[in-house]
Regions:
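C-terminal ends and interior cores of transmembrane alpha-helices
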Residues: 81-110, 306-324
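Intracellular juxtamembrane helix-capping segments at the cytosolic ends
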Residues: 128-143, 343-357
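C-terminal transmembrane helical hairpin of 12-TM major facilitator-type secondary transporters
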Residues: 298-345
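Transmembrane alpha-helix termini and helix-breaking/packing motifs in multi-pass membrane transporters
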Residues: 31-36, 63-68, 94-100, 160-184, ...
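Cytoplasmic membrane-interface "Motif A"-like loop-to-helix N-cap segments
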Residues: 67-84, 293-308
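Juxtamembrane intracellular "pre-TM" segments in multi-pass secondary transporters
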Residues: 1-4, 205-240
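Helix-loop boundary and gating motifs at the non-cytosolic
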Residues: 1-57, 66, 91, 233-273
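Helix-to-loop junctions at the C-terminal end of transmembrane segments
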Residues: 58-71, 174, 284-297, 388
């Protein structure tokens, strides 16, 4: 009974955290917030890197710090409180405090508001990195193997429902004004506080790694030892995950290509793609989660294989110029299948990272992997943006090659349940 209670408390906390992620989308809410305060347009380009890679890059350093510590509850609570403070700063200072201090129409007020939003987002991402690391250990210590994928699946399904609700709310609101932004801020703060209350009494201790003597090891030996950890299980996981990042990277290029193919069609719209993605999450997440509990590596492979097959079909359509002869609904269905595949790769990756190591080793493993992937996402994003002029055929070809390479080397990955 205790295990069931802990399981559902963790699920509720994950759902609330995912709700906050949805509400603080770098594609909708945050650009609208910058626009509402009149911030310079160049700041828009910093939102996604700060929001996504900003929460991944510091995890290796954080993991190294956590490695010699056994308590995970206090760092998690501290990071959640910090996130709440940065959310409050991000919305309340520019929308409520600054208008009383300066002329809201002034350039200086707009610039300062923009910098406060970006600084708060940076702090939020750093705090989120610690939350992510410690939550993995909370899941790993309180949920046995065979239950973790189920938890991820349930939380993702609920997040899919919430994303549909939020998308519908956004679509029916022709403008996201300051009042709605403040409601979103209030919703995020409520979700964070409730999540803290749900898990604050769940004590989590892991076996600290105190084998190495930090005082007698030279800096050179420390660097060599650190580099050597990027081998074996971790090396294959990072390499495969770097290839499978294409399951997510393909989405924006596919959407833009579809919108350009049918620019005047109301069915092929951003709202349709958001609904397709949310529906895919609802339909597939629980199934992927259950499969991950059986074999997380296989789940990653199947998800990536689905996206690879869609990539090949897209290449055929582009090469023979079939796009205009296809019914518009086929683009939405295609994106639905892409989203199903991405959910599989994502679910398998999460459970694999939880199951392959234990205790402080898990913290170190996940931290280094996430930092590496943060760098990979930035580099691939810059690379694909730089070669976008080459056309969709070249882009999708490179992504298909990346997925194929990842599928081949994924068989070198150690089975996490063995």
């Amino acid at each position: 009974v205790k295990d069931i209670s802990v399981k559902w408390r963790i699920i509720l906390s994950l759902i609330l955290t995912k709700l906050t992620d949805i509400l603080l989308s770098a594609k909708t809410t945050l650009p609208t917030l910058l626009n509402a305060v009149g911030a310079p347009s160049w700041m828009l380009g910093l939102l996604v890197p700060l929001r996504e890679s900003g929460s991944l890059l510091p995890q290796a350093l954080m993991g190294a710090w956590l490695k010699n510590k056994s308590d995970r509850q206090k760092p998690w609570l501290f990071s959640m409180v910090l996130q709440s403070l940065f959310i409050a700063m991000m919305f309340l200072l520019p929308l409520l405090l600054f208008p009383y201090m300066w002329n809201i129409e002034s350039v200086s007020c707009a610039a300062i508001s923009g910098f406060i939003i970006l600084a708060s987002l940076s702090g939020l991402s750093l705090s989120r990195a610690m939350t992510s690391l410690t939550m993995k250990d909370i899941q790993g210590e309180h949920l046995r193997k065979g239950m973790r994928g189920n938890v991820v699946g349930i939380a993702s399904t609920a997040a899919g429902v919430l994303s549909l609700v939020f998308a519908t709310f956004s679509f029916f609101s022709s403008t996201m004004n300051e009042q709605i932004l403040l409601v979103i801020a209030g919703g995020c703060l409520f979700a964070m506080c409730l999540s803290i209350l749900i898990l604050k009494n769940i004590e989590t201790k892991v076996d600290a790694d105190n084998d190495s003597d930090e005082n007698t090891t030279s800096i050179k030996d420390k660097v060599r030892s650190y580099i050597e950890t990027f081998s074996g299980d971790l090396a294959y996981f990072i390499l495969v995950r770097s290839c499978f990042v294409h399951t997510a990277l393909i989405a924006p290029f596919f959407i833009v290509w579809s919108l350009n193919a049918y620019p005047q069609n109301t069915l092929v719209s951003l709202s349709s793609f958001i609904i397709a993605q949310g529906s895919a999450t609802i339909v597939s997440s629980y199934i992927w989660g259950k499969l991950s509990d059986y074999d997380a590596r296989l789940t990653m492979q199947l998800g990536a294989l689905i996206v690879f097959i869609i990539c090949v079909l897209l290449l055929i359509v582009i090469h023979f110029d079939f796009a205009q002869s296809l019914p518009p609904i086929s683009f939405i269905l295609c994106y639905f299948v892409l989203s199903v595949g991405h959910e599989g790769a994502r679910s398998g990756r999460k459970v694999y990272a939880l199951d392959i190591k234990v205790g402080a080793q898990r913290t170190d493993f996940i931290g280094k992997a996430n930092t590496s992937i943060g760098i990979v996402i930035l580099l691939l994003g810059v690379f694909y943006s730089a070669i976008s002029f080459a056309g969709n055929f070249v882009l999708f070809s490179l992504m298909a090659v990346g997925l194929a390479f990842g599928l081949i080397i994924s068989f070198k990955m150690k089975k996490e349940k063995s």
